[in-house]
């Protein structure tokens, strides 16, 4: 009976610790992959995109586009 209690007493916290460490590294890997596949867009990128189309946006229009992108997610 003592052996079972000792095994559970050590096994459960050890399993939780290993799970937390594995979860941390897996989440970091997934986050980096998502950032690589879908990088965040900046105001300068929006300005450059519209400049290529021949339009010059005002600062208000750029802020409005950024707001709409954030609300879309």
From Swiss-Prot:
Bilayer topology annotation: Single-pass membrane protein
Domain of life according to the entry: Bacteria
InterPro entries the UniProt entry points to: UPF0154 (IPR005359)
Subcellular location per the Swiss-Prot or TrEMBL entry: Membrane
Primary site of residence: membrane
Keywords for the protein's UniProt record, in alphabetical order: Membrane, Transmembrane, Transmembrane helix
GO CC, alphabetical: membrane
Cited Pfam families: UPF0154
Family in the record: Belongs to the UPF0154 family.
Stored HAMAP family: UPF0154
Name of the protein: UPF0154 protein MG335.1
Species in which this protein is naturally found: Mycoplasma genitalium (strain ATCC 33530 / DSM 19775 / NCTC 10195 / G37) (Mycoplasmoides genitalium)
Taxonomic lineage from the root: Bacteria, Bacillati, Mycoplasmatota, Mycoplasmoidales, Mycoplasmoidaceae
